[in-house]
Amino acid sequence: MMQQQKPGKPKKINRIDKIKRLQINRSRRPDINQTVPSPLFYVRIVVTWLGMVSLDAMTGFRFELLWPTWLMIRAAAESIQMRNQHCVTTIANPTAARFSVLFICVTATSDLICYLFIPIRMLIFLATTYVWISLYYHTQGGFLRSLATVYGGERLQSWPIVFITCFIVIFELFLRIRSHPILISFFPNVAEYAGVSPVWPRSLNAFFGAHSIGYPVILITVSMHYYFNEWKLRRKQCDVSNRNEQLFRILVEGLPAEYEGPKDYTSQQCLEDDLYYLDPPVQTLQPMQAIQAASATPPTSSKKNGIHKRNGDVTSSTTTSSRKKKHNGNSGFNSTPPNDKKKGKSIRDVDMDDGDDSDDDYSYRDTSSSTIEDQRRGGGISIIRFIFSSAAWLFSFVFESSTPSENSLSNQQIDDDEDYEDGDGDKKNGRTDSMTSTTKGRANTMPSTTRSQNNNNSQKQQKQSNGKSHHQHSSHQNNHQKSNGNSNGHARGFAAVRDSSHDTNASNETDIRSMSRELESLRSEISSRRSQEEDFKLQVSMHESNETRLSQQLSNMRLKVEQMEIKCSSIERHRESDKHQLEQAERKYADLLGKKAEIEATLSAERKARMEVTSKKYDVAEHQRERERQLESEIDKLRIELKSKDESNMRMESELHGLRNYKEENDIDSLNMELRFVRDKSHQMEESLAGENKLKQSLFKCLGDARDTIKSLERRVQEFQIKNGSSIGGGSSETLMNGRSSTEANNENDTTASDQSSPHQHSAMGSPVPFAKMPLSVNVSNRHGSPFNGKVSPIASIGSVLAAAGGPAPPDYMMAVGANVTATTGPVPQKQPRAGFHGISRYNEFTNIASGGEHRLFDTPASAISASAINGSNPEDDFLMNKGKFGAPSQPAARLA
C-alpha cells in the first residue's frame, strides 16, 4: 500500500527559543529544587557561625548585625551606578531599592522606633535571629524560594532548611539570651558572660539591631505595596479583556459565517503561529492522493473549538467528533495550526498513548515530561500565585458581579459541544473504532469551503435520483463520505448521466447516438465504480488494520483497568487500616490532651520558679557591682579614718612619751601629796560654802520673824499711846519714833547688804539673780563694836532690838561661821573680842578683807597663811610657779628637797 510522504515544511522556531537567545547577558537565578547543597556548603556555614559566636564571646559585639547595613550600602551604591529612576523594591530583589531622601528618612524613622520601644534583650534576639535565618535563606535562593522548597520540594532539600531554622531560633533564645551561665562554663574568662561587659558593645548591638529590624520592615512594606498595585493592574487588564471579548463576539455574530463550525469570540494578537489563519484555503487533492493521505491519517477527527487568550497566555481547547476528542494533527491538508499539535498533546496522559504510532509521539512525551517537571518545580510559587488569585477572586466577588461575556462564552462552548457530538462514538484515549468516525475524520481534514460544496452536491444528487438502487447507493455513499475528492468528481459525472437519461426517457426518443452516449457513460460509470471499489477495498483494509490495533489497545486498557482495580482494592484496604489507626490515634490524642493539661500545669509552675531563679541570677552581677561600689566608698572612708587615727595615735604616743619622760624625771609621791592637798582644800571650801548657805537661809528666816515682831510691837505701842494720852505719851513716842527710824535704817542697810550677796544665796532664797558673775560678798560691818569697818551688820541691829525688847540676841555671823568651822576642823586659837560682845567666841580666818567691809569666801585662811609664813613662802604661789606642762610639778625632786 502506497503512502504519500509529507511535503517538506520549513522548521519553525519557537518563541521561547527566541527569547532565550535574546537573554545573552542577563543573570538568571537557579530554579527551585535544582541542586542539593553539598556538605562543603554546610561546613562553610558552620565555620562562619562559630567564628561570629567566638567574636561575640570575646568582644561582646555581634558582628553579624553588620550584614543588613552592608546590604543597604551595596544597594545604595548599585542604585547610584545604575541610575535607574524606575526601580522598584521587591522581596525577591531587595538590592533594587530606589534610594531617595524619603526612603532614607523612613528607614531611619523605623530604626529609631525599634531602638526606643523594643527592649534591648528582645531587640538583639530578634535582630540576630533574623540575620542568621535571612543569610541562610539568601544562600538557598531567597526567602520565597526557600519556603517553596519546604512546602513543595523534596525532603532531601526541605529538611535541612527546617532543621537549621529551628536550631538558630533555639540557640539564640535559650543559649545566648537566657542562659549565660552555660556559656560561662565554655568561656570562663570572657567578660561578657561574667556580667562586667563594657558599655559600648551593648550600645552598638542595640543600634545595629534596630537597623536589622527596621530596614527589612520597610523593604517588605514597599514590596507589598508594589504587589498590591500590580494586582490592581492585572485586575483592570482582566476587566478590559473581558469587555473586548464581549464586543468582538457581537462583531463576529453580526458578520456572515464563511464556514460551518463554532465561532471564535476571543480576541487575540497576530503571532507567528497565527499566520496559518491568514493563508488561503488549501486546494482539493486528486482522488488517489486523497486515498493515500487518508491511509496515512489516524482514524481520529478533531475540530478547533476556540482559542482563549488572557494576559498574553494562549491556550487552545479541542473537541473530537465523538465527544471532545483530542486533536492529532497528522493530516496532509494542514487544516490545524502548527502549534495545536503540541498544545493538544500536552494535555494527554503518557500512559494512555503507548499504542500510538504517530510521528509526534516522541515530541509529546518530551513536552509532557517537561511540563510535569515544571509543575513540580513551580509548586511553591504556584501556592503564592494561588493565594493572590484567591484574594483577587474574593475582591471581585465582593465588589463586582460576573460579566455577561464570560457567561456567553461558556454557553457558546456548551452549544458547540452539543452540536458536534455523536451518540454512537465512545471516547477511549482520543480514538474510535467505528467506520463513521473514520470517514468523518477524513472529511474534517479538509477546509470548510470544500465541505460545503460537497454537501451541496450530495443534496442535489439525492433530489434528482429516480429510485434506482445503484444510484441510491452511490448517493448514500457520497452523503456518508462528505468530503472525499474522488467521490466529489464521480458525483458530478453521475449527476450529468442521470440528467441525460431522464431527458431521453421523458421524450421517448430511442436514438442510437443517445444510446451510444449512454453506453459510454455507463462504461465510464463502471470504470469509476471499479475505482471506487478499489478505494473501498483500501478503506476496508485500513479499517481492519485499525481494528487490530484498537483491539490491542483494548486489551492493554483492560489490563490497565485490572491493575487499577487491584490498586483500588489495595487502597481500600489501606484506607480501612488508616481509619482504624486514626481511631486509635484519636483515643491516644484524647489521653495525651489530659496528660498535656497536667504537664502544662506543672510546667507553668516550674517556669515561674525558673523565671524567679533566672531573674535572681541575672541580678547577681548588678548586685555585685553595686556592692563593690559601696565597699569601695566604705574603704575610702575607713582609709580617711585610719589616717586620722594614725595622726591622733602619733600625737598620743608623743604625749605618752613626754609623760613617760616627765615620770622618769619627777617624783610621783610629791605629786600625789600636792594633789591630795588640793583635793582637801577644795573639799573644805565646798563644806564652808554649804554652811554659809544654810546660815544665810536661817538668817533670812530670822529677819522675817523680826520684822513681824517689830510690826506687832509697833501696833502695841500705838495702842498704848492712844490709851495713855498726853505728855508721857509724847516723850515716849518720840523715843519710839527715833528707835523706829533707826531700826528702819538698819533694815535698809541690811537689805542693801543682802542685795550685794552672791547669786547662790539669792537663788537659795528664791530671789532673782541681778548679776550672774558677781563674786560672793557679805557685809560684816557693825556699829556696836564690830571689828570690821564700813556698813552696819544686820545681825547686830537685830540683836540690839531684841535686847531692847528684853530677849536674847541671836549669834553673830562670824560667830556662827567660826562655830561651824570649829566643829569640823577642831579648835583654833581665837582673838579676844572687843567690848560689847562679851561671852561670844568668834572665829575669823580671813585676813584679806576689802576696804568697804566685804571679803571673799575663797580667800586663803589665816591658818594657811601662818603655815606658809613659817616656811617663808606661799604654797599656792609655789604650786603655780612649779606647775609643769600637763599640770604636774615641773621639779618634784627639788620640791621635796
UniProtKB/Swiss-Prot annotation:
Chief subcellular location: endoplasmic reticulum
Membrane spanning residue stretches: 113-133, 157-177, 181-201, 204-224, 379-399
Alphabetical keyword list: Coiled coil, Endoplasmic reticulum, Membrane, Nucleus, Transmembrane, Transmembrane helix
Comp. bias intervals (Polar residues): 291-304, 329-338, 403-413, 432-451, 734-761
InterPro entries: Macoilin
Membrane-topology annotation of the record: Multi-pass membrane protein
Annotated segments matching region Disordered: 291-375, 403-535, 724-770
Phenotype of the disrupted gene, per the record: RNAi-mediated knockdown results in defective avoidance behavior in response to P.aeruginosa.
Biased composition (Basic and acidic residues): 510-535
Name under which the protein is recorded: Macoilin
GO cellular component terms given for this protein: neuronal cell body; nuclear envelope; nuclear membrane; rough endoplasmic reticulum; rough endoplasmic reticulum membrane
Biased composition (Acidic residues): 351-361, 414-424
Protein purpose: Plays a role in the regulation of neuronal activity. In AWA and AWC neurons, plays a role in regulating olfactory adaptation by controlling the forgetting sensory responses to odorants such as diacetyl and isoamyl alcohol. May play a role in regulating daf-7 expression in ASI neurons in response to bacterial small RNAs. In ASI neurons, promotes dauer formation in response to pheromones such as the ascarosides ascr#2 and ascr#3.
GO process annotations (BP): chemotaxis; locomotion; neuronal signal transduction; thermotaxis
Coiled coil (residue ranges): 503-726
Subcellular localization: Rough endoplasmic reticulum membrane; Nucleus membrane
Domain of life: Eukaryota
Entry comment describing in which tissues the protein is expressed: Strong expression in many neurons, very weak expression is also detected in others tissues.
GO terms of molecular function: microtubule binding
Biased composition regions of type Low complexity, renumbered to the chain: 452-467, 475-490
